[in-house]
């Protein structure tokens, strides 16, 4: 079972704590194009997960419309790192997933799995300044704090096999369709 194999591999590779500076430096050294991203914890999770999954069971990535899905073997999988609380220490229960059209297409084609790593973030302005300088973002004061660290609390894997399961998840409130944004050229996603 692909889901079980993914879970076993990821349980072994996810670190007990993700330090922002260490992870960003590792991503840069590995040539990962997302090392400058402010949501480094999600891109770091994707990088280490894909690397280990590809090494142990093979796989690739897939692009549907304008959306990249993180891992594909027999099924399409999307990975997310979700913070269990915001900067004010309030619990955050919603995790934003991918574009609705691409999600529906992936479900139609093969089914779609969501791999969600939930963790407790530590927000820190000193790290934010370091990150901005490291990525070459100028010297003006950053507007909001970034996550200095991310401590994994739970790995959850969900699989939606078809449109019927998607509709059931939406009607039960397990999934919610948000208003869809626009691309940089102003056209709908």
Where are these regions (language model features)?
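Nucleic-acid endonuclease domains
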Residues: 1-67, 72, 80-189
